[in-house]
Amino acid sequence: MMSNYLSQLISQHKDFPKKGIVFKDVLPLLQHPNELEGLIQGMSTGQIFESSDAIVSIDARGFIFGTAISMKLSKPMIVARKPGKLPGELITHSYELEYGQNSLSIQKKAIENYQSFVIVDDLLATGGTAMCVSEMLKEAGKDITGLSVVVELGQLNARAYLPFPVESQIIF
């Protein structure tokens, strides 16, 4: 887990995207390259990456952190995208958000040469997006070694319901 200083760089927006939600925005971290480098270092040293073949990053903020980790560890990165964003043969699943419903897709061809994956995202709230990606990978006969996130909303206790290890850098 990272320092309290990093958690202060996360901006919070009350009643966004809907009333009752306090949105945690990781984008201000990108304005602090030294802290961002430390964050990526912390995320990259997690045990869950040791036995993984590749990374699946979740649309869209997960791409930022997944790309940096992919480059640091020299591991391939596959993207899980929102509807209508990927060509080719896809695996698609729906999931529930704190504030609605959506779906994600992964290209079948992108994962065919790899067996084990770490899922990377910016934030763990209810666990819906991580489970969605997990279900797509399992449907394809793949393994999940864990989930790596920048921020975890600890009060929602999503990690208790996820069937794989969770590594978080900041817990609110």
From Swiss-Prot:
| A GO-annotated cellular component | cytoplasm
Annotated family: Belongs to the purine/pyrimidine phosphoribosyltransferase family.
GO term, biological process aspect, one: AMP salvage
GO molecular function, one example? adenine phosphoribosyltransferase activity
Protein name in the entry: Adenine phosphoribosyltransferase
Catalysis performed (reactions): AMP + diphosphate = 5-phospho-alpha-D-ribose 1-diphosphate + adenine
Gene that produces this protein: apt
Cite the PROSITE patterns for this sequence.
PUR_PYR_PR_TRANSFER
The record lists the organism as Prochlorococcus marinus (strain MIT 9211)
Q: Which NCBIfam families match?
A: PRK02304.1-5
